[in-house]
From Swiss-Prot:
Protein name, as recorded: Arginine vasopressin-induced protein 1
GO terms classed as biological process: positive regulation of MAPK cascade
Stretches with biased composition (Basic residues): 80-92
Pfam families hit by this protein: TC1
This protein's encoding gene: Avpi1
Length: 146
C-alpha cells in the first residue's frame, strides 16, 4: 500500500523552528526585559501621569535615562501602583437584620461601633503589614540611581 503522505512530506514552514536549540518548542519570541527601552520620554510621562503618580515627570526622566540598564527593568517589575482602599469591599459590607433595628436600638448602636472599630483596626494592621520592611516605589528608583 505504501507510506502516507503526511509521514513522508516535510513539515510546513510555519512549524519549522528557526530558534536556537534552547528556544525550540516555543512558538514566540523572548520578551524584552525592559519594556521602556524604545519608548519616548513623553510616552513614559503619560503612563506615570495616568496611573496617578505625583512625581510622574521625575520618574519618567529617570527611567528614560537608564532605559538599557537591567536594574531599571528589575525596579519596574517591583513597582506596583498604589490603589486607594475600596470602600465597598465584600468583607466590610454588612446587611442590617430586620428585627434588630426596631427591637433594640441600643444594641444596634453597639454593633455598629464595634464593627467600625474592627474595620479600623483591620485597616491599620493591613497598612502596617503592607509597609513592613518594604520601601516605597521611590525607594526602588533611588536605589538604582545612587
Amino acid at each position: 500500500m505504501g507510506t502516507p503522505a503526511s509521514v513522508v512530506s516535510e513539515p510546513p514552514l510555519w512549524q519549522v523552528s528557526t530558534a536556537q536549540p534552547r528556544d525550540r518548542g516555543r512558538g514566540r519570541k523572548q520578551a524584552s526585559a525592559n519594556i521602556f527601552q524604545d519608548a519616548e520620554l513623553v510616552q513614559i510621562q503619560g503612563l506615570f501621569q495616568r496611573s496617578g503618580d505625583q512625581l510622574a515627570e521625575e520618574r519618567a526622566q529617570i527611567i528614560w535615562e537608564c532605559a538599557g540598564d537591567h536594574r531599571v527593568a528589575e525596579a519596574l517589575r517591583r513597582l506596583r501602583r498604589k490603589r486607594p482602599p475600596r470602600q465597598n469591599h465584600c468583607s466590610r459590607l454588612r446587611v442590617p437584620e430586620l428585627g434588630s433595628t426596631a427591637a433594640d436600638p441600643q444594641a444596634s448602636t453597639t454593633d455598629t461601633a464595634s464593627s467600625e472599630q474592627f474595620g479600623n483596626s483591620r485597616r491599620t494592621s493591613a497598612r502596617v503589614h503592607r509597609n513592613w520592611n518594604k520601601p516605597g516605589p521611590t525607594g526602588y528608583l533611588h536605589q538604582i540611581r545612587h
